[in-house]
Amino acid sequence: MLARAPGLTADHVRALFAATGEESSLCDSAQLLREMRVPAAARNFLASPDESALSADLRWIESSGTTVISCLDAAYPPLLAQTDGAPPVLFVLGSVEALGSTQLAVVGSRNPTASGRGNARDFAAALARSGLTITSGLALGVDAASHRGALDVGGITIAVMGTGLDTVYPAAHAELAACIRAQGALISEFPPRTAPAGCNFPRRNRIISGLSCGTLVVEATCRSGSLITARLAAEQGREVFAIPGSIRSPQSRGCHKLIREGATLVESLADVLSELQIPLPKQGVRSSMRPRPTEVAMDKGYEMLLDALGFEPATLDELIERTGLSSESVASMLLILELDGCVAALPGGRYDRITNDDRQRSRHPDLRI
């Protein structure tokens, strides 16, 4: 019932419960609801609920195995509970426990470049291997790549939906949604039979940021909805991270805008983990599903890049000149080699090769800067 009351928030429900001691009194406390400035539409619905809609909701919830969590339940996500306008109810398919895990939102363009898509997947995989749950919005582009990156390494991922849980949007992501449910959770504040609508997605975004200790924007235009998520994260007192890109790419301008406004510039996994005060993962932890270059046999392109790097630090431009590869290819390969522990990012935009002896001792100290 609470999910269908327009404009009702967790703050309203908690305040009323504190005043009366009864969750059920919501329907019988018209005066209190007015005093708490609950919207008239919500008051009217609570006074005269649509019983047929509620019965249909209940039937679907029971048949689908959905868990319903109210803001009064211990299972309600603690970080989300701290935010203004948090939803009074969450519908969950999958692991309820995942909602209480340490989460990082990874978001960005629905139409990313190949480099942006690769960065989303690789960063999500590395962050998941570091113990973070990857939270995103199941949208095309960066969202989907982020979910897949976490799934690749057996990590936990949460999809916050802008529809009811009975409607996967976009429909092409039905299989991805099933994988997320099996390895994490699908959640929504919207009751069953809620169709996709433009006004739903900014509301979804506040939950994505509210669940998370920080938000990483991988790639975004200046009009991207992911900038809404970043703004909400900042307003909620959470960290905001952004990956820079080409000055000529419209898909990078949103990230550059965030960096100018104070977002943490991200070039490596360590940039995120150090800001969140999370230790770097131990060397040798890798995906069992997505092979990295050092596993079994290294692709010739990676061998050429490592040969070009040698054992003296070099800049990206120097490596492009030595290999003859495109800037996007070299940047993507360096990221993968860095995540695999073969290369270290140094101050000043330089890269250094890590030897087997280095790996046995520890990660390169500059990774911790």
Model feature map: region roles:
Residues 1-85:
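N-terminal positively charged helical leader segments and presequences
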Residues 7, 62-369:
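Glycine-biased, small-residue-rich flexible motifs in mid-sequence functional cores and linkers
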